[in-house]
């Protein structure tokens, strides 16, 4: 029974990631075909800036969250506050230097994504993780394409950012239930 549950858990992660990767590939091929080389290049340039900035803001928080959550050490809220603050600083720095609202908000979306998924995986909520991944990809496609036709390339970045909104639920739920305790950082 335990073995079949583990296979089921691993399968749900694998299937969600495969579906997510496949839909993402189709989405980006579609965006490349309608935006043209210059528009697609600009999009990937700003996504690269957002990914780099979010990785700086997350600096080890994802792995820390997975390990401590799995050990049932209640560090999440403290980690979230620190990481979200660094994410907001990154957002404003990118907005100041590149004047791109889509890339700036994408930083915050990627930070929220990293923190939320690390908690879900640390708690071994694999099916919940799968639902969030598939929901995010559906939102990425609908918002990204929809906003492209309204705002152009900037709309793709905004749509991509908006697609991470469901993950806020995990953050808010944790902030309400887990006490902030800076003494855990020794």
Model-derived features: positions:
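Transmembrane alpha-helix boundary and packing residues in multipass membrane permease domains
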Residues: 17, 29-33, 47, 63, ...
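Hydrophobic/aromatic positions within or immediately flanking transmembrane alpha-helices
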Residues: 14, 41-44, 80, 130, ...
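Transmembrane-helix boundary and interhelical linker motifs in polytopic inner-membrane proteins
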Residues: 3-4, 35-39, 50-84, 121-127
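Alpha-helical transmembrane segments of multi-pass membrane proteins
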Residues: 8, 12, 16, 46, ...
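Hydrophobic transmembrane helix module of multi-pass membrane transport proteins
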Residues: 82-186
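Signature of the first transmembrane helix
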Residues: 3-59
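Alpha-helical transmembrane segments and their lipid-water interface positions
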Residues: 20, 24, 28, 54-62, ...
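Hydrophobic alpha-helix/TM-entry signal in multi-pass membrane transporters
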Residues: 5-13, 79, 129-132, 186
